[in-house]
Amino acid sequence: MALRGFCSADGSDPFWEWDVSWNTSNPDFTKCFQNTVLVWVPCCYLWLCFPFYFLYLSRHDRGYIQMTYLNKTKTALGFVLWIVCWADLFYSFWERSWGKILAPVFLVSPTLLGITMLLATFLIQLERRKGVQSSGIMLTFWLIALLCALAILRSKIMTALKEDAEIDVFRDVTFYIYFSLVLIQLVLSCFSDRPPLFSETIHDLNPCPESSASFLSRVTFWWITGLMVRGYRQPLESTDLWSLNKEDTSEQVVPVLVKNWKKECAKSKRQQRKITYSSKDPAKPKGGSQVDVNEEAEVLIVKTPQKEREPSLFKVLYKTFGPYFLMSFLFKALHDLMMFAGPEILKLLINFVNDKKAPDWQGYLYTALLFICACLQTLVLHQYFHICFVSGMRIKTAVIGAVYRKALVITNSARKSSTVGEIVNLMSVDAQRFMDLATYINMIWSAPLQVILALYLLWLNLGPSVLAGVAVMILMVPLNAVMAMKTKTYQVAHMKSKDNRIKLMNEILNGIKVLKLYAWELAFKDKVLAIRQEELKVLKKSAYLAAVGTFTWVCTPFLVALSTFAVYVTVDKNNILDAQKAFVSLALFNILRFPLNILPMVISSIVQASVSLKRLRIFLSHEELEPDSIERRPVKDGGGANSITVKNATFTWARSDPPTLSGITFSIPEGSLVAVVGQVGCGKSSLLSALLAEMDKVEGHVAIKGSVAYVPQQAWIQNDSLRENILFGRQLQERYYKAVIEACALLPDLEILPSGDRTEIGEKGVNLSGGQKQRVSLARAVYCDSDIYLFDDPLSAVDAHVGKHIFENVIGPKGMLKNKTRLLVTHSISYLPQVDVIIVMTGGKISEMGSYQELLARDGAFAEFLRTYASGDQEQAEQDDGLTGVSSPGKEVKQMENGMLVTDVAGKQLQRQLSNSSSYSGDVSRHHTSTAELQKAGPKNEDAWKLVEADKAQTGQVKLSVYWDYMKAIGLFISFLSIFLFLCNHVASLVSNYWLSLWTDDPIVNGTQEHTKIRLSVYGALGISQGITVFGYSMAVSIGGIFASRRLHVDLLQNVLRSPMSFFERTPSGNLVNRFSKELDTVDSMIPQVIKMFMGSLFNVIGACIIILLATPIASIIIPPLGLIYFFVQRFYVASSRQLKRLESVSRSPVYSHFNETLLGVSVIRAFEEQERFIRQSDLKVDENQKAYYPSIVANRWLAVRLECVGNCIVLFAALFSVISRHSLSAGLVGLSVSYSLQVTTYLNWLVRMSSEMETNIVAVERLKEYSETEKEAPWQIQEMAPPSTWPQVGRVEFRDYGLRYRENLDLVLKHINITINGGEKVGIVGRTGAGKSSLTLGLFRINESAEGEIIIDDINIAKIGLHDLRVKITIIPQDPVLFSGSLRMNLDPFSQYSDEEVWTSLELAHLKDFVSGLPDKLNQECAEGGENLSVGQRQLVCLARALLRKTKILVLDEATAAVDLETDDLIQSTIRTQFDDCTVLTIAHRLNTIMDYTRVIVLDKGEIRECGQPSDLLQQRGLFYSMAKDAGLV
């Protein structure tokens, strides 16, 4: 009554009247309702939003937008609207001034509306000043205002059409103006303003259109349509992709996570300290003795470690990403509430159909409400999904960035516990787990909320009978809990097996050359398959568990429905199961099905993420290197004249291990050249590592003054151009760069490289020789122009004359670095007289230290060492360097032979690629060369010289053959059985629901329904058949998935191992690791799940359409066109989605390749202090990967919104046709039809998601199969051509007009080789760098097949027999000593062919018996990844032991004694002479003195044999061999 007086002066205008607004065929709102509610609703909305929006804008200032026509128009219209509203107000005052009695509403409403319009105008300007280009708040306000005005407009038009209507002309005119202006404001709000001034998007060449998209465009994801169209017309390329939004980049995301993690770690340490302190001072109990107190204190201190609080990574992730992610809570809650509107409207619709007297407009209203509700649900749901996916993407970016940064600083002991495989898995699999969790995590609270709301509405519908359903759900809880615990256990075991497999695959890929040379592929294949078998066992258990889980989860909603209906109809005969109760309940049960089905997935995802969270926390908590353990001072700082000062320092590789270096004390003055010498394993390399802070300093003081450069023993080369390897991130200074190139003897190499210094160097420098890699590594250090240089045997891998050149021009007293402090680890004695100080290492300690003369004078171990090894066998020694022997007191020391033992460790790869077609002839030229000349023009066919092949993305639709391949991998029987069981399950589901509709239409006789028991029994039986078929298809798909995983992995492994070496040189290891980790994980885990969900969604959609057509045949007019629209949109989407997935996969490989490369060279990166640059590179590669991922997730949303709109249309037409045909339809069929249509949207959404997931995930199968089509090497064994088991008996090797090239389009690197090597001959092979020495051995092992001619061993053409038949009969001691993780025995004898006694004998002959006997586990001692727990020299001795064990008739030594000290080298040479006395020995030598007693020497130059004969004869000829011997100081 109060509102009557408010709305009209005489109280005659009611606020609400049912007969006017509801119970009529032509409804309308009352005048009072129009003037109050319809005016106030938009005002209340804006005023409620204003304080929150104002606060948000004040905190999020994006910049200032200049006034535009759009902004000016909106502002002007705002003022006009304010004037129009207040014109109404002044008109009311004017009326009152004329004595007209007006209701208060005519003053209040215009005033409120006018002030609201001023507020709207103020917000338009505030948004402009804060850089808001399009406002959702304002668009919603204008939309609400328009909808309210629309209702008033309809009423005014209806009133105007009445003959006797009273018309208020002024207010009607102002209203029409108001309506028009609001409509214009709404239209203008749909457009976006220009970007703010100084916005980054202005300068971005290809900015993401999202940032400048309008609100409507963002809500409907319309802004990505341009990319979708481009992708539909032609395959997308990486250049088509937009830049990432700034807030999604690594630069923004990673530092925040790292900062929060450091805070959390510091916090946990502080809390730990508090706990420790509190435990030390316990309160003394009354009456207790002091002894009791002390005992209690001891107990507390002992228990303290149990109370250690680990830093919480979950808290850190929440703190970093929580604020943005919390928005998803709001959208999810809104969606969940809207979801229950459907069943309630369905209830009203069924009641409407039953009430034949109800006006038709009510049915249309319910239909419109269903449609609007469904559309809003769609928009809200996909905003929720978008936030979740973006959060997941940011988490993945942050995790990868944090792992990479941590990998650069963890200690060496920590690196042993986290292998490369594990760290790669952290970046690929574990980071992906967090992404997956982001989409599911909200279901933790959402699923229970949905269950509670559903049960509440079911209670209202069916009463206490619902408790039966609740009981069923409660019974399932412990079962789900047990399965979750089991799932976690299996997940941990699975990840452990996967880590081990990836670790082993990494080693295989890094050491593939050695595997091929030794014919060990099968042994390592079996090792990988054994680990894989364990992995598949766990997967199989998980699959069985998943099948049981699927059975319970699918059956639970049906059992809930069955038990509820059964109790409802049996407890009271008067309980009638009519259409309203049954189908509203069924709709609610269907809603209930989703949270119950999704919860197991959520639990599984949480379990997986918790495992990953723990793994990541452990890795990020590893100890870090302490650069502060070494005092670093700038050069300008005084602090004495010493560059390096070490006082009583002790170092260890791990705190738990005994010290590696102890009692180290020395000082090195600025500008000194210091040599470090000693036997293998004495701690020379460790000393350099200690100075680089790579080791733990236990005690002592270390001070370094100035910057440091480091040349490691094994050269680390990046997959980049030669120039970039040398510049190493520094600016090009042309003159200095040329000087470095010349000094490091690289000019001749550049002249033969196809593009000079721009030539691409393969991964790990595969296309450079060991010497070339070492020189590039040296040039990198020299170019950086540091104050202190640490050289770890840099002259080891180069020829004597090149070593001499480098020492003279770079390291020595007259070299480029003569004023720098240089610390040189060396085995060569020829340079020792020229150094300032010599440090002699023995057993991790400095045994002697002093100048060359001082050490000789002391007549200690060093002098004895020199006497033994400095007097060569050649009496006619020439002193090229003019070095004179120095006499020690009372003794005469013979003159040194310059360069007698100049060679050491070679680079990691045996393979020469382009370099072997060249020669290094004569002295290094000293002419000036410009960088333009250094960049030699490549051949016309650029691809001929392109070595590394980037991971390529396939284009176009995934071929049907890929699906067929996967089905064959599963097994055709299991494939078709799965489809049949799926079909049976969904037929049973459809029949059960149709049966329910028939039941609800049963006539009611005397207040009850007949045949209730039969109906219930059949309904139950159909449900049981559903359960059986569900279990059947889950089991079939899971087992089939495991079969497929096994077969695809075996095929991939077999194909990769059967690939020739050229394949591994062209293919970055990141690509291969990607296949064995991420792609295989997709096949293992994702594809079986996607198949189940895809098949389920497909049959659900077909079933829903069948039911709708059955209920309303008229729907056949609409469903086919909607189906066509659906199909077109889906195909339109898949064209882009598929390509985006491929681009994402391709851009993922460089992330892993760069990461692997970084791990291999981490000590070099740290030494040069280049961590920041490498972090930036890693971030850039991750961002490139996310540039492809982000559009793919948005494209998913784009598709879902459009397809759900198609689904919403099905809801609209199903309800509409039910209203139209209500007089001829039963309530049961209407209920069935509409309840199914309500599910269609969800089914369609899932079908499209799963079909696209299917296509995008099947790409993994495509990428695994990709390598089956690559070129393969010759068969390993050819039974019909197998040589006799005793072959070769003599060891005679003949080269007949032999020629070799590395690739078809390259020149020959060996030409017209004609030579016969008789059995038992000892032949040395020498030549300048790149002459083709190693190429000859590669040809002998058929690593590269001959281009012309043939090789005959004991009358058998080696090209005719199997590769393994050949390779097991020849033994090589390679340039690069490669060991694999596993026992020492496995590294010697992987096939377990020899007895322990034979193994020990080989170790004794290789001078390793004492060392191995001293190990805790002897032969079973575990070797670290890459054999890193042995020195390079010890690894080389293990390779010698392998050769001794195999004892074949032909032995090849490829610079095999490079990494050992002089004494060990002497022992090895004598071992080879005695143990291989009756064998044919081919030795590639840098140290010419080792082959001077050989039968013959072959001199190669430019791939041809230039000289051949006995060493003494060749010396007399004074040709190439003579000049090389002269360089080595042998003549």
Curated annotation (Swiss-Prot):
What's the superkingdom here? Answer: Eukaryota
- Per the record, residues carrying N6-succinyllysine are K503
Q: Where does ATP 2 bind?
A: G1327, R1328, T1329, G1330, A1331, G1332, K1333, S1334
**Topology relative to the membrane:** Multi-pass membrane protein
Sugar attachment sites: N1006
PTM-bearing positions, type Phosphoserine: S289, S915, S930
Q: Catalyses which reaction?
A: ATP + H2O + xenobioticSide 1 = ADP + phosphate + xenobioticSide 2; an S-substituted glutathione(in) + ATP + H2O = an S-substituted glutathione(out) + ADP + phosphate + H(+); sphing-4-enine 1-phosphate(in) + ATP + H2O = sphing-4-enine 1-phosphate(out) + ADP + phosphate + H(+); leukotriene C4(in) + ATP + H2O = leukotriene C4(out) + ADP + phosphate + H(+)
Renumbered residue ranges of the record's region Disordered: 917-938
Domain ABC transporter, first and last residues per copy? 644-868, 1293-1527
Q: Which residues lie on this side of the membrane: Extracellular?
A: 1-33, 96-100, 155-172, 338-363, 462-464, 569-590, 989-1025, 1111, 1225-1226
**Cytoplasmic compartment segments:** 55-74, 122-133, 194-316, 385-440, 486-547, 612-967, 1047-1089, 1133-1203, 1248-1531
For this protein, the record's InterPro entries field holds: AAA+_ATPase, ABC1_TM_dom, ABC1_TM_sf, ABC_transporter-like_ATP-bd, ABC_transporter-like_CS, ABC_transporter_C-like, MRP, P-loop_NTPase
Q: Which residues cross the membrane?
A: 34-54, 75-95, 101-121, 134-154, 173-193, 317-337, 364-384, 441-461, 465-485, 548-568, 591-611, 968-988, 1026-1046, 1090-1110, 1112-1132, 1204-1224, 1227-1247
Which purpose does this protein serve, as stated in its record? Mediates export of organic anions and drugs from the cytoplasm. Mediates ATP-dependent transport of glutathione and glutathione conjugates, leukotriene C4, estradiol-17-beta-o-glucuronide, methotrexate, antiviral drugs and other xenobiotics. Confers resistance to anticancer drugs by decreasing accumulation of drug in cells, and by mediating ATP- and GSH-dependent drug export. Hydrolyzes ATP with low efficiency. Catalyzes the export of sphingosine 1-phosphate from mast cells independently of their degranulation.
Can you say what this protein is called?
A: Multidrug resistance-associated protein 1
Species in which this protein is naturally found: Canis lupus familiaris
| Gene name as annotated | ABCC1
